[in-house]
């Protein structure tokens, strides 16, 4: 089996690329970073530090790389069995024209073996969005052929890959946590379902997308916002603070109650999942900075994201939400000189006051009880 993976950054090399190579798939990375491309083609291998209770170093081998903006990448799309991405949501649109060209070439060459494309991004139904961009870039006479022979498979991904703080100057070395989760929508594949260790197949992807958003992302953000307020440097420092831990765990339990109601998750299994996530936040090898995790507070306070969406679920089912409110209030206090959204948030609160500002950012009714609860909590933190 041959695969092409767009994005040879830390997540591409440390997570998806590693799983594919470990499964014995012939893997080519596509990227624009010439230093990384040259290193991959010189060595055909790289090291991944996998850190949990202990640290182990795995070597990923048998890989090569091409530029994502040249002809080579188009040729490969005409030949491979699987295309994956880890480029960031914004970049999906930029790689779509190359994918479209490759699909046209595949059709011209008469290659009718199934191709599956999986975007592995921190977003909901990212592959469906990529498909829209690819379809827009295709000539009309290729669209029906692509619909018939190419699967666009949505996925949910979860692995903490912090920015490399390695003392070496090796452009390929990467650190990842032991935990990883790659869940794909098995209803969207063309041809036989792949058997790749570390890839889980489901016919209910949205349940797992929300489970991650409402647990890992909610907990991570609240840990960062409360941690910043308490002058902690890292996520580990923050979660070891008992006061913060109680609120974070409480918020994940509140959002979890929504998931259990909505999707029928088993309550005991979900409690174990929350414990596992608290353990991930404590990982001593992950120097995860609270400022990095907290950045873009406007996005994180928007209606469909990790703080407001679970809160809306608690309102829908009439469930408690005291800790989620604490997290939202802490997010409103987030300040960072390096983050334009943090500055915009501060300006909005200064201009309109916390009540109107939160309503504008989150879409919540300014006169609602929850907004007033959040404003009370916000003022209590000043």
From Swiss-Prot:
It catalyses: D-mannitol 1-phosphate + NAD(+) = beta-D-fructose 6-phosphate + NADH + H(+). Disulfide bonds: none annotated. Coiled coil: none annotated. It comes from the Bacteria. One of its GO terms (molecular function) is mannitol-1-phosphate 5-dehydrogenase activity. Its EC number is 1.1.1.17. Keywords: Acetylation, NAD, Oxidoreductase. One of its GO terms (biological process) is mannitol catabolic process. One of its GO terms (cellular component) is cytosol. The modification N6-acetyllysine is found at residue 269. It is an enzyme of class 1 (oxidoreductase). NAD(+) binds at residues 3-14. Gene3D superfamilies: N-(1-d-carboxylethyl)-l-norvaline Dehydrogenase, domain 2, NAD(P)-binding Rossmann-like Domain. Belongs to the mannitol dehydrogenase family. This is Mannitol-1-phosphate 5-dehydrogenase. It comes from Escherichia coli O7:K1 (strain IAI39 / ExPEC). The gene is mtlD.
